[in-house]
């Protein structure tokens, strides 16, 4: 199985006249499965429609989850946008939206969750608190627990798991440049400590895709490949590409 993995395209920042040129960089392959690990774009936008139509027609199957930015500046709650996305993706025969849900494809169980972080110091805030309607750190942590409960319940009765989350599932996956004293509180918004879960279920998890951080990475934890390929903001010039694949 050949998996194309991408995250953090941030289509909401692409000009409408640039969108077709932007997505052509994907160079799709009909033999591949596409993994979209969140922060793809504003789901209420034309750019999002153009992109999803292209993806649906270009890969034999796509699995997508929401990141935090899917919920930004829509005057909608997280629950309202989740409901919208469930209905939105019904029009696409080859795309599955996973929101604390799983789906079997061939012999693998694709498991998807935004995996919100657990916030221990609410005094240090990021844009999520301002850009998402009716959202605060209490709801943030409540969503975090729902995601963890889902993953723990799913793994009990399923094997051959391909896990897709937006938030980073281990502090070990945070780039060293962010592990400095003035970034420690900031990092709590980027990762969810799933180390015990990973260790306990290392024989069931085949690979794990994530996003949120704009640092590309392939790293093994407990012999599980953890993969991240963010495109990032255009002004970051991080030079990641659309064509990274993982063969399982």
Language model region names:
Residues 61-132:
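A basic- and aromatic-enriched beta-loop-alpha substructure that forms the phosphate/nucleotide-
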Residues 10-17, 41-46, 69-76, 102-104, ...:
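Active-site environment of divalent metal-dependent phosphoester hydrolases
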């Amino acid at each position: 199985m050949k998996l194309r993995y991408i995250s953090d395209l941030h289509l909401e920042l692409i000009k409408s006249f640039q969108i077709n040129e932007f997505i052509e960089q994907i160079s799709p392959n009909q033999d591949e499965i596409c993994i979209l690990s969140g922060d793809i774009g504003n789901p209420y936008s034309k750019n999002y429609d153009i992109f999803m139509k292209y993806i649906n027609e270009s890969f034999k199957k796509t699995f997508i989850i929401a990141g935090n930015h899917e919920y930004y500046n829509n005057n909608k709650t997280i629950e309202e946008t989740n409901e919208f996305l469930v209905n939105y993706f019904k029009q696409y025969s080859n795309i599955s939206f996973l929101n604390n849900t799983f789906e079997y494809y061939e012999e693998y169980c694709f498991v998807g969750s935004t995996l919100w972080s657990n916030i221990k110091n609410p005094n240090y805030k990021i844009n999520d608190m301002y850009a998402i309607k009716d959202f605060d750190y209490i709801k943030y942590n409540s969503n975090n627990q729902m995601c963890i409960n889902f993953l723990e319940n799913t793994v009990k009765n399923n094997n051959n798991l391909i896990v897709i989350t937006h938030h980073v599932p281990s502090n070990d996956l945070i780039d060293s440049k962010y592990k400095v004293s003035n970034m420690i509180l900031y990092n709590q918004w980027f990762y969810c400590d799933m180390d015990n879960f990973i260790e306990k279920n290392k024989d069931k998890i085949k690979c794990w895709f994530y996003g949120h951080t704009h640092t590309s990475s392939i790293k093994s934890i407990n012999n599980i490949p953890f993969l991240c390929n963010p495109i990032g903001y255009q002004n970051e010039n991080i030079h990641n590409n659309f064509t990274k694949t993982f063969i399982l």
